[in-house]
Regions:
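Outer-membrane beta-barrel "beta-signal"
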Residues: 34, 187-193, 228-242
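Membrane-embedded beta-strands of outer-membrane beta-barrel proteins
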Residues: 59-61, 121-123, 183, 236-238
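Transmembrane beta-strands of outer-membrane beta-barrel proteins
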Residues: 30-32, 76-78, 138-140, 198-200, ...
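Bacterial Sec-dependent N-terminal signal peptides
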Residues: 1-30, 238-242
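Extracellular/periplasm-exposed beta-strand and loop segments of Gram-negative cell-envelope proteins
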Residues: 37-54, 82-116, 144-178, 182, ...
Length: 242
């Protein structure tokens, strides 16, 4: 019994020492600019996809946990704006019921705006190469809290669309979770003030632009999904530590 009690005390003391070593050595706030974009995988009938980065804000809480004099864990909890503006052309294929009109086509060009807001958790691992410079890497877990998708379509060519009634505007089907990877560097201007730059690459599909590009009448295959999207971003930020 005495041995068990002694071992328990030693284990508790050891756990307490390890837990104390994982307490944050510094807390801080981080504010910056997020240069966001998306990558896409188009389906049949979709052409000329062009994306334009969206500028957003990124900010939240930041801390440093020293493992030793070189290695740190730097968790972040941030509000981040992502998304992009993107254009694409597509062909709307349709057949007429009860007539001999088959394989008809209308060509459209589109302009789209997608704005997303996330709460992002970044358990970053940091290696201090010097007193001023640190190399950072780690996973990123993002939870979607809001979205805004605005599609605009225009017919390509001089002729009006023959089947505009059935050609509905595109919709966006979002995913609530995104998991990715952060790679970056930090430069300490002072002991408590640093500049941070990182690249974020999302691994999961964040959503899909849905659009009926073939009505599937008279035996044709119905095509509804235009393309799926993934997040990409460059983040430039400042952090102040207390």
């Amino acid at each position: 019994m005495k041995k068990i009690t002694l071992l328990t005390i030693v284990a508790l003391l050891s756990f307490g020492a390890n837990a104390q070593s994982l307490l944050p050595t510094k807390y801080g706030i981080k504010v910056g600019l997020n240069i966001a974009n998306v990558t896409s995988t188009p389906n049949e009938g979709v052409d000329n996809i062009e994306t334009t980065p969206l500028l957003g804000v990124a900010g939240g809480f930041y801390m440093e946990i020293a493992l030793n004099d070189k290695w740190y864990i730097n968790p972040e909890l941030l509000y981040v704006q992502k998304g992009a503006s993107f254009n694409y052309d597509y062909t709307h294929k349709w057949d007429s019921i009860g007539t001999n009109q088959t394989n008809n086509e209308d060509k459209y060009g589109t302009t789209n705006s997608l704005k997303l807001a996330y709460v992002e958790l970044n358990p970053t691992i940091s290696y201090k190469a010097s007193d001023k410079l640190a190399l950072n890497f780690g996973p990123s877990v993002s939870f979607l809290i809001s979205e805004d998708f605005v599609p605009i379509e225009n017919i390509i060519g001089d002729n009006p669309p023959q089947n505009a009634v059935e050609n509905k505007l595109a919709t966006y089907a979002s995913e609530d979770l995104d998991v990715g990877l952060n790679l970056g560097i930090s430069y300490y201007l002072t002991e408590n003030f640093l500049v941070d730059a990182k690249v974020n690459t999302g691994f999961m599909k964040i959503g899909a632009v849905n659009k009926t590009t073939s009505t599937a009448k008279n035996g044709n295959e119905r095509i509804e999904k235009v393309f799926e999207l993934n997040n990409r971003a460059i983040v430039l930020s400042f952090a102040y530590l207390f």
